[in-house]
Amino acid sequence: MAMQKIFAREILDSRGNPTVEVDLHTAKGRFRAAVPSGASTGIYEALELRDGDKSRYLGKGVLKAVEHINKTLGPALLEKKLSVVDQEKVDKFMIELDGTENKSKFGANAILGVSLAVCKAGAAEKGVPLYRHIADLAGNPDLVLPVPAFNVINGGSHAGNKLAMQEFMILPVGASSFKEAMRIGAEVYHHLKGVIKAKYGKDATNVGDEGGFAPNILENNEALELLKTAIQAAGYPDKVVIGMDVAASEFYRNGKYDLDFKSPDDPARHISGEKLGELYKSFIKNYPVVSIEDPFDQDDWATWTSFLSGVDIQIVGDDLTVTNPKRIAQAVEKKACNCLLLKVNQIGSVTESIQACKLAQSNGWGVMVSHRSGETEDTFIADLVVGLCTGQIKTGAPCRSERLAKYNQLMRIEEALGDKAVFAGRKFRNPKAK
C-alpha cells in the first residue's frame, strides 16, 4: 500500500526540548511517530540535526529536520511509490538519499521519524499488531515479554546530585509475568521513596529526567545500599536484582576516571580503569548486581576486554557500540562486552536497528532495548522489544507518563497475547534458550 501523505512537525519532548514528529497517511489511516533524544550521547552516534539558532529554543529547534521531511524526504518517498510493508526498501532509499555515513545531511531524527511511522503503517497494512510486524521483519516466529529494568536512582548527566554513575536499576527477574514485574517494580520504588525520605529528607525524593530519585549522595555504593534496603523492605530479596548504567565516558579524563566529576577538577583523585574495575567487582560481590552498562570510556577498549574476562555478569555496551554494526563487530572481535544496548535513534532507522540486534544475538550477546532520557508519549519501543525477543527493556522508573506509556503498552501486549504470552524472567539475557 502506497503512502498518500507525509507531514512532519516540531513537538516538545519530556525535557521541554524540541523533537520531530511525523504523520504518515495511507488508505488505512494516519500513523504517527515521535523521535526521542539523549542527554549523554556517544560520540559515534548518528547525527541528531538541531537548528543552532540561539534565538529559538536555545539553539535546539528541529525545524531544519522537519523541513527536510516536508520538502525532500516526504515528496521523494511519495514519488517512489514504495509500499509501507517494505521497511527495508524504504529505509535504504532514505539512507541512500542522505548519502552520509552518520545521516548528517537530513539528520537521523528526520530519517528515524519517517522510518518509525512507516513501520506502524506497515503493521496496519498487514492487519497485525506492531510487535508481530516487527517480529516478521526480524524473522522471529516467537514473541517474548521483557524484564523491565527500572532506573530508580539517577546520577551522572541525568541528575543535579554529586553521584557519578548515571543509573541504578531494579530488575524483577523473579516475577512470573510482565504485569507482576510492574507491580513488584512499583512497590520497590515506593519503598525506596520512603527509605530516601527518612534518610535524606523530602527534597531528596525529587525525581530526575527518567523518573528515578536523585538524592544528593556522592558514594555509588550508598545508592546500592539504598536499593538493597528498599528491596528488602518490599519483601522481594529473592525476586529483584540490580543493574547499573555507569556512563563512564562522562567522567573519563585523560586516560583516567573521576568519580567526583561534578566538583571542580582535581587530577589527584582520578583513578585508573583497572582500579575502577576493582570497584565494580566489589559491587558484584556485595550486592545482587547482574548487569553493568558502559563501565569504561567508549574508546578504552583494553580495559573493557580485561574486565569482561574476569566477571560472569552482563556487561552492556551503549556509548561503546551506539547500535552501530561496525562498532558491534569491533566489540565482538575484541571481546569487550556481552550485551548490546539498542537505541533506535543512535543508528536512525528501524531496519538498521533490527540488523544491529540480529548481529549482537548471532554472536551470543544479550540485547537490552532502551529509551532515551528525552522521551515522548510514543510507545514504539514496547512493541520493538517484544518483536525482537530481546528479553529486557529499560525505559525509566515507574513514574512520569512518557516512561509509563511504554510499560503500560507492554502490559496491554501481554494481555492481548493471553496464555501465549512468554515472560523472559531469569532468562532475560537469552530468552530464547530452551
From Swiss-Prot:
Enumerate the subcellular locations listed in this protein's record, separating them with semicolons: Cytoplasm
Report the residues modified as Phosphoserine: 83, 157, 176, 263
Q: Which residues carry this modification: Phosphotyrosine?
A: 236
In terms of SUPFAM superfamilies, this protein maps to: Enolase C-terminal domain-like (SSF51604), Enolase N-terminal domain-like (SSF54826)
Q: Which residues carry this modification: Phosphothreonine?
A: 72, 205, 229
Report the InterPro entries cross-referenced here. Enolase (IPR000941), Enolase-like_C_sf (IPR036849), Enolase-like_N (IPR029017), Enolase_C (IPR020810), Enolase_CS (IPR020809), Enolase_N (IPR020811)
> What is this protein called in UniProt?
Beta-enolase
For this chain's record, the cofactor binding note is: Mg(2+) is required for catalysis and for stabilizing the dimer.
Give the originating organism. Rattus norvegicus (Rat)
Gene Ontology biological process terms, A to Z: canonical glycolysis; glycolytic process; response to xenobiotic stimulus; skeletal muscle tissue regeneration
The record ties this protein, via PANTHER family, to:
BETA-ENOLASE (PTHR11902:SF5), ENOLASE (PTHR11902)
Residue numbers carrying N-acetylalanine = 2
Recorded superkingdom = Eukaryota
Q: What is its main location?
A: cytoplasm
